[in-house]
A protein has these predicted regions:
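Acidic/His-rich structured neighborhood in mature extracellular/periplasmic domains
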Residues: 1-126, 170, 179-182
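C-terminal soluble interaction/assembly domains
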Residues: 138, 143-215
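Helix N-terminus capping/helix-initiation residues
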Residues: 107-108, 131, 193
Length: 215
């Protein structure tokens, strides 16, 4: 049984970004009730905004990006920009190849097959991203990336597309990441610039950037 869980006390990187997006949409539309917020969060979190079962959730962030562009919540900033010169070919299968790590998949062949069908359906899609070495020169990117944009870190880890997500924030002319840190166990604005943060992580290839519509 799948239901919408709202928990603002315990956030991972994805639920942090989802909640920021939901609150932003509510602010833009002048929605002020908790039920409005829950309705928007549900729309963001699930394929087509509908909860049927565990497989209704947008489990990989590339899926989240695609479906929420379709629903009109976000746009991808990188489209057609020469700075975003690298290409990621989607090839996700981490969940189905490691189904023992997911309690809903380890005991349910129908769910496993359903997730695998989604994986196969979207694998092969190509996405432009900004290579991490291009983050070094703030002058190049300051006109492209705004504070409040969603940053998705592209990874070369097998079976995954995005390793971490957060919110862009400019501080003294340098781009930083606001994110739910698994290391610090809380939401932080990282002391490191996004360039330095990315260079420390060998598996990080670069970033995709999404903007909440209306901001």
């Amino acid at each position: 049984y799948e239901r919408l869980i709202v928990n603002l006390r315990q956030l991972d990187c994805t639920t942090f970004v989802e909640n920021v997006t939901a609150l932003s949409v509510c602010a833009r539309e002048n929605y002020s009730s908790f039920s409005d917020y829950c309705r928007i969060l549900k729309k963001l979190r699930y394929w087509g905004g509908e909860i049927k079962n565990y497989t209704s959730r947008l489990h990989y962030f590339s899926w989240w990006g695609l479906d929420n562009q379709k629903k009109g919540f976000i746009t991808e900033v990188s489209c057609g920009d020469s700075l975003f010169s690298a290409t990621q070919v989607l090839s996700v299968d981490y969940m189905t190849n490691n189904s023992h790590l997911y309690k809903h998949l380890s005991s349910n062949a129908f769910y496993r097959d359903s997730i695998r069908n989604y994986e196969n359906l979207y694998n092969g899609l190509k996405f432009s991203f900004l290579p991490k070495n291009r983050l070094k020169n703030s002058k190049d990117i300051i006109s492209k990336i705004r504070s409040g944009d969603i940053i998705a870190i592209v990874t070369n880890k097998k079976g995954l597309d995005i390793s971490h997500v957060g919110i862009a924030i400019w501080i003294k002319g340098k781009l930083h990441l606001m994110h739910a840190s698994s290391l610090k166990k809380k939401v932080i604005i990282d002391d490191l610039t996004l360039y330095d943060y990315s260079m420390k992580q060998k598996s990080n290839l670069g970033i995709r950037v999404f903007r909440i519509v209306g901001f």
